[in-house]
Design a protein with these regions (language model features):
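Iron-sulfur-associated redox domains of electron-transfer enzymes in respiratory
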Residues: 1-153
């Protein structure tokens, strides 16, 4: 579904999302890097870059996470599954090539059996992409059948 969000409306949009309990993530300067990271306001958003130094995938695949805990009770093992691992979030400023990876991974994590961690995060996280106005030698959008201004992804 295509919608347009104008730069002048970022601040009120970010504030309203945060008021609704969404974690807001966007490209943000961190020393000499541009990282997708949580922001408090639209003034932290940096859009003058080709691609971020990290991918949206890290918000779907944390580096570490608790997948279960267990307790030994006499002759049996009690297993507890974690709750609240899928946080409502909006990621601004993803490039189409990065967002295009999600439907590909959907096929992997919903093939034979469904990965509930993946599914719940996919349902909880909304991606807002921005078209590219420049590229560098590491860009690969055309390699995956996209273009810098792709509507899919």
């Amino acid at each position: 579904m295509e919608k347009r969000l104008y730069k002048k409306d970022f601040d009120s949009f970010v504030t309203s999302l945060q008021g609704l309990g969404y974690k807001t993530i966007a490209p943000k300067k961190d020393n000499n890097l541009i990282m997708l990271d949580e922001i408090q306001g639209a003034d932290e958003i940096s859009l003058d870059h080709v691609i971020t130094n990290n991918s949206i995938k890290e918000f779907f695949f944390p580096k570490t996470e608790k997948v279960l805990s267990y307790r030994m009770a006499k002759n049996k093992v009690e297993i507890e599954e974690p709750e609240g691992f899928a946080v409502k979030a909006v990621i601004f400023g993803s490039r189409p090539c990065d967002a295009f990876s999600l439907p590909v991974m959907d096929k992997v994590f919903n093939w034979d059996c469904s990965d509930k961690f993946w599914v719940q995060r996919r349902e909880a996280i909304t991606i807002v992409t921005i078209a590219c106005d420049k590229c560098d030698s590491y860009c690969f959008c055309t390699s995956v059948g996209l273009a810098p201004d792709a509507k899919q992804g």
